[in-house]
């Protein structure tokens, strides 16, 4: 959930968590309780390229705050995590391509009528889907096409499974992984029209989506851009069903703010 505070996020989570018998993706396992002090791992080798210096400085301040709160801050090696963006932008568009195939104006979406059924589909999809949606459908269709499935989609899933095992092994020695939320602060609406640069802004957050691990982004510091003060965030990632650990650490930043 998107909320104004970590406390509000926890309240919403407590409402939506748990098993729903009508939802096959839900789980009855209860979240792990808080433990107070945590061992927090920082994959520093992942923070070398593409991160604005003041964003990195802000991240170091956040680490110092957590250290002062009694948490143990250690370096952790996650060599495969650098591939998360590439893997994500193969798997995710493939899923978009598959899911959006139902958007035909008959079963889903508003119909724009043409001369025949094929034109119904092309007009509806061409007129109702945005540029980014179309781009992701095309990327996904390409990755799933004959001759490229094994080269792209299948390999992406293999790397994803390797990343999952790597992170699970890391969590045997640490409790939480800490990263900046984004390598840069927010840019102006319409300022960044390059899709690749837009995708690169997700570099630190896509791994949680790929692996299904709980994560939280907390606005903690501020940086200056063109005489404007912009927030930057701290991202915390926990093992499966350890959401309470994220809220425990995050709520202390709420108090500081």
Report each predicted region and the residues it spans.
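Flexible, glycine/charged-enriched surface loops at secondary-structure junctions
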Residues: 21-27, 70-79, 168
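Short acidic, glycine/serine/threonine-rich loops at helix termini
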Residues: 52-54, 85-89, 189-190, 230-233
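Glycine-rich, small-residue loops and helix-cap segments
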Residues: 16, 73, 102, 111-257
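Glycine-rich beta-alpha junction loops
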Residues: 16, 44-48, 78-82, 93, ...
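A short helix-breaking turn/cap at a secondary-structure junction
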Residues: 1-58, 62, 117-123, 257
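Flexible, acidic loop-helix segments that line cofactor/substrate-binding pockets
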Residues: 24, 37-39, 43-45, 76-89, ...
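Charged, often glycine-rich, active-site loop that binds/positions anionic groups
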Residues: 86-99
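Residue-level signal for inorganic ion chemistry
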Residues: 9, 40, 66, 100, ...
